Amino acid sequence: MEKLHFKEMGSGQKIVIIHGLLGSSDNWITIGKKLSENFHVYLVDLINHGNSPHTEIFNYFRMADDLYNFFHFNNINKAHLIAHSMGGKVAMKFADIYQNHIDKLIIVDIVNKGYPTNRFNYIFNALKNIKTKNIKSRKDADQHFSNYINNLSERNFLLKNLK
């Protein structure tokens, strides 16, 4: 059980927001700030994303349990849950298991169906084949990613996650 990293703002009814694959809480900061004018907002980094711990166990059941523990550690009995893409899959699993903890469920850009498991292989190949000792700058990383990923926006999204 890992403690998830999060950003917190505002007061009132609680809203928990979860990012998508390869994203982080930073993806929702603008919307979170706006919502915090009327709500108590939590922007959560799922495991293996953002500033949350990294682990080899990575599946929807595990992430739903991590989210349950996040609710517990932060004394959240019930909240509105907003989730994007892969985070939406986590939120749906959470709602299935822990429905009493959800007030409203808002899923963005994903449906409850199976998707091809190879859909993002080109991105995972780029990440798997990076030689970190050869990367001295974001430009070096972008050059590596460009061998696998043609779309500049996708490369920039990956580059945002570099530390």
Model region roles, listed by residue range:
Residues 1-15, 36-39, 76-77:
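Alpha/beta-hydrolase fold catalytic core
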Residues 29, 33, 42-82, 86:
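Active-site loop/oxyanion-hole signature of alpha/beta-hydrolase fold enzymes
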Residues 92-97, 102-136, 142:
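Flexible "cap/lid" loop of the alpha/beta hydrolase fold
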Residues 118, 133-163:
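Conserved alpha/beta-hydrolase catalytic His-Asp/Glu region
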Residues 12, 20-23, 85:
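Active-site glycine-rich loops that stabilize anionic/oxyanionic intermediates
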Residues 22, 46-50, 112:
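Alpha/beta-hydrolase active-site loop signature
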